[in-house]
């Protein structure tokens, strides 16, 4: 199936501890913090550049420009603290088969190893299944053992496909049937 995406309809997901929802402009500072925390092994186009971009203003504009939809990276908010700690969701990165979006997540370092990535990922998987997707996939750097562990916990299996980059390392492709 091409997915249960309903154009123009925002997705909001809830778990015991989390709310996954569209980003708000004021939360661009959280996105900027994610950019600043990225591992130096991540390619430059996904890190802050020499001129300091993306800036908070750049990210605010990006949030304004992105209309809520049924596919995208949702802000992950802790319900008890009412703070945004990262993102999780589905993207169409163009690297996978038609109708099979990629699941992606990234959380602030200060909340790692508390089960939030697993909890958010399971909510996205449940939503994807109920929306009619049959399979999802995810990419992960071979050196990113924490994210590989989360993907394994939620049922993703590493595929034979890999992309090797002599500078940044190997990207592993994982998939999960729903």
Could you tell me what each predicted segment is?
Residues 138-148:
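Conserved beta-strand-loop-alpha-helix junction that forms the acyl-donor binding cleft
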Residues 131-139:
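Conserved GNAT acetyl-CoA-binding A-motif
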Residues 151:
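Conserved active-site tyrosine of GNAT-family acetyltransferases
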Residues 1-110, 122-127, 131, 157-178:
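GNAT-family acyltransferases
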Residues 106, 119, 146:
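Short alpha-helical segment within the catalytic ATP-binding CA
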Residues 113-118:
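Glycine-rich acyl-CoA binding loop
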């Amino acid at each position: 199936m091409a997915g249960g995406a309903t154009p123009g309809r925002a997705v909001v997901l809830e778990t015991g501890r989390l709310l996954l929802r569209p980003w708000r402009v004021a939360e661009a500072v959280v996105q900027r913090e994610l950019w600043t925390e990225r591992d130096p092994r991540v390619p430059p186009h996904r890190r802050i550049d020499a001129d300091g971009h993306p800036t908070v203003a750049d990210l605010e504009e990006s949030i304004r420009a992105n209309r809520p939809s049924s596919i995208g990276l949702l802000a992950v908010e802790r319900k008890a603290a009412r703070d945004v700690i990262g993102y999780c969701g589905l993207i169409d990165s163009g690297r996978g088969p038609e109708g099979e979006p990629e699941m992606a997540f990234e959380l602030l370092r200060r909340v790692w190893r508390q089960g939030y990535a697993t909890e958010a990922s399971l909510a996205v998987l449940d939503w994807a299944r109920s929306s009619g997707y049959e399979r999802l996939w995810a990419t992960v750097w071979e050196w990113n053992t924490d994210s590989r562990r989360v993907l394994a916990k939620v049922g993703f299996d590493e595929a034979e496909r890999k992309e090797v980059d002599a500078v940044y390392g190997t990207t592993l492709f994982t998939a999960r049937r729903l």
